[in-house]
Amino acid sequence: MLLATDADHIHDEVDAALGGDHTVVRVHAGAEVLAAVDEHGPDLVVLVLQIGNMGGMATCLDLRLEERAERIPPQRVVMLLDREADVFLARRAEADAWVVKPVDPLALRRTAQDALAG
């Protein structure tokens, strides 16, 4: 599983919720996600909406463009949103699923399982 966040507490929360089922690889910026997808071939990509120089929405859109160009295999993407109003952004970015922070470990685990199931 690939996690893109620059916040240590988010990494800790996601690792606690999903780390038992997945190896969590972390990048600190959205611009690092594509290279990490190529290198690690994750089953799931978790993007925080607000990350460094390239936010979760732009990163998700970039992954979708790369998929359509057949440069990467299809990715399952879960976005961690700041508020309910951000659901619109997750839909526009074509995320497979999303969770509104603060992260509820059970909700995140369930959402990740649903996203992986397709």
Model-derived regions: residue spans:
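Conserved acidic segment of CheY-like receiver
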Residues: M1-D15
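Conserved sequence signature across two-component system core domains
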Residues: A4-D6, V27, V45, L80
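Acidic, metal-coordinating helix/loop segments flanking the phosphotransfer/catalytic sites
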Residues: H28-L44
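His-Asp phosphorelay/catalytic-motif detector in bacterial-type signaling
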Residues: D43, R68-R76
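Conserved phosphotransfer microenvironments
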Residues: D43-L65
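Two-component signal transduction core modules
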Residues: V45, W98-V99
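Alpha4 helix (beta4-alpha4-beta5 surface) of REC/receiver domains from two-component response regulators
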Residues: A58, M79-A97
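C-terminal output helix
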Residues: V103-A112
